[in-house]
Amino acid sequence: MHLEHDRPLGGGGAPAASGGAGPRWQSPPGTPAGPAPTDRALRVGVGGPVGSGKTALVAALCRALAGRIRLGVVTNDIYTTEDADFLRSAGVLDPGRIRAVETGCCPHTAIRDDITANLDAVEDLESDLGRLDLILVESGGDNLTATFSYGLVDRQIFVIDVAGGDKVPRKGGPGVAGSDLLVVNKTDLAPLVGADLAVMARDAAAMRGGRADRPVLFTSLRSDAGASDVADWVLAQLPSPARPQ
């Protein structure tokens, strides 16, 4: 059973007719994030290309935050439950706090165009576990055009990496330009691929309009400590009563 959502979507997004076919919610790229909710868990989407390190980031965030706040995870894969299985086997959370969505379609469809399956998973988590502070929703691997509907998440993290060289940020796209947080991962590979991190920082800032409210963080997730700045950013998004003291 679906819950009511008090976050209207900018740009005229609207729910599909009850019982009708088609997407439940739609939101255009660039729809601004609103204030953090106080009546349910904050939902943070984690998107990015295949292999950029989304699952590694989610795992590191779970390890960093599990003892401090109440959280759950929803993963997306096209045909398998691979990412959820990895998180469970790694022991980053109690297995009951991790749910998997098999989209059977392009990853962006399930996080932007028809978010019903993901909303069901999110709402089932909250129904089964009670009040949570945070739910991380990991997208399946997609390209630079992938964005989440703000009917599904309250904040968006977009993960790219340096393996493709320092040109990736200036290729732009909604994820690079419009996400609430851009993470440039695998910085330890920069010398091996000839990527200039200063160039990536400059180009990423330019693509994001130099806005202080849309930061860029550089990470290497070879150890969980590499996600500490991202964890701090996530905690800062929580409404004040939910933030650990």
Curated annotation (Swiss-Prot):
GO terms for biological process: urea catabolic process. It is found in: Cytoplasm. Residues 1-43 are annotated as: Disordered. Its main location: cytoplasm. The keyword Aminoacyl-tRNA synthetase does not apply. Disulfide bonds: none annotated. One of its GO terms (molecular function) is GTPase activity. InterPro entries: CobW/HypB/UreG_nucleotide-bd (IPR003495), P-loop_NTPase (IPR027417), UreG (IPR004400). The keyword Secreted does not apply. Residues 9-22 have a biased composition (Gly residues). GTP binds at residues 48-55. Keywords: Chaperone, Cytoplasm, GTP-binding, Nickel insertion, Nucleotide-binding. GO terms for cellular component: cytoplasm. Facilitates the functional incorporation of the urease nickel metallocenter. This process requires GTP hydrolysis, probably effectuated by UreG. Belongs to the SIMIBI class G3E GTPase family. UreG subfamily. Homodimer. UreD, UreF and UreG form a complex that acts as a GTP-hydrolysis-dependent molecular chaperone, activating the urease apoprotein by helping to assemble the nickel containing metallocenter of UreC. The UreE protein probably delivers the nickel. This is Urease accessory protein UreG. It comes from Parafrankia sp. (strain EAN1pec). The gene is ureG.
